[in-house]
Amino acid sequence: MAKYSKEALDEALLQAQSSDISMKTKGIKFLRQASCLETGTKNTYPIRDWFSETKNYTKLFKIVKSEKDPKLLWEYLFLIKTYCERYIDLAYLVKDSQNFIAKKENTEFKIKACELGELFLVNQDASVRQAAASLLWYLKKTSEVWSVIIELMQKKRDYITLSHIGIMIRNCYSLLNDDKVITDSFENTVTKENLISLKDAEALKEAVSFSLEKTPKAAKKAGFNSVSETLDGIITTLTKTAER
C-alpha cells in the first residue's frame, strides 16, 4: 500500500480520534506531513482527492472543533492552512488538475477553514491564536488579525510563533506595494486600506522592538531585524496614503 493512499489517510483520521494521546498525535502528524508534501508528485493526487471528499473534511473539522490540546490545535490549523495553500490554491501548477480546480468542495473546505480561524482567534492559548490568525490572514487578508497578533506578542515570543508572524508582516508589505489587484483566497477584491491600519502597523513595530529586546535570540533567529525594517516600509506607505 502506498504511504499516502486513501486507506492510510483514513487510518490517520481514525487515529486522530483516539483517546490515546500518542495514537492521536501519530494520526495528526501523518495528516500534517501529507499537507506539507511537495505537490506535483504521485502523492499529490490521492492526498488532494482524500482531503476534498466532503465526508473526510467534515469529520476533520469536527475533530478540530472538539480538540482541547493547544499543541494539537496548532498542528491542525497549520495543516489546514498548508493544504489550502499547496493543494487548492496552487493546483494550477499541477498537471491534469482541471477537474480538481473546478470542485465546489475546495471552496467549501476554505469556508469551513475560515470558520475555524474565527473560532480559535479568541482561544485562551496564544499559540492557537497565532495559528488561527495566520490561517485567517492567508485566506481573507483581513486586518482583524493584527490586534490579536499585537496582544499575543506581549506574552509569547518563541521562534516558531515569531517566524509565522514575520511571514504575515512580509506578505502584508508585499501586497501594499504591489500594483496588481489584491484578492483573497476566494477571489474577493481586498483594498489596501483594509489590509492594515497605520495604528496597528505602529503597534506592531513596537511589539517587534519589544521582542528584539526581551527575547533577542528567538527574535533574531526569526529575522525580526528585517521584519522591523519591513514595518518601517509599511508605516511609510500608509503615511503617504493618508496624506493624499
Residue ranges and their predicted role:
Residues 3-13, 40-62, 89-95, 107-118, ...:
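Amphipathic alpha-helical scaffolding segments comprising HEAT/armadillo-like alpha-solenoid repeats
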Residues 19-20, 68-69, 124-125, 157-158, ...:
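Short inter-helical turns and helix N-cap capping residues of alpha-solenoid HEAT/ARM repeat scaffolds
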Residues 24, 73, 129, 161-162, ...:
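Residue-level detector of extended alpha-helical repeat arrays and alpha-solenoid scaffolds
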Residues 25-37, 71-82, 131-134:
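Non-membrane alpha-helical segments in proteins
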Residues 27, 76, 132, 164-165, ...:
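Conserved hydrophobic register position within alpha-solenoid helical repeats
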Residues 34-38, 83-90, 138-142, 168-179, ...:
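Residue-level signature of the C-terminal ends
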Residues 74, 104-109:
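Alpha-solenoid helical repeat scaffolds
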Residues 204, 208-244:
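Eukaryotic acidic, Ser/Thr-rich intrinsically disordered low-complexity regions
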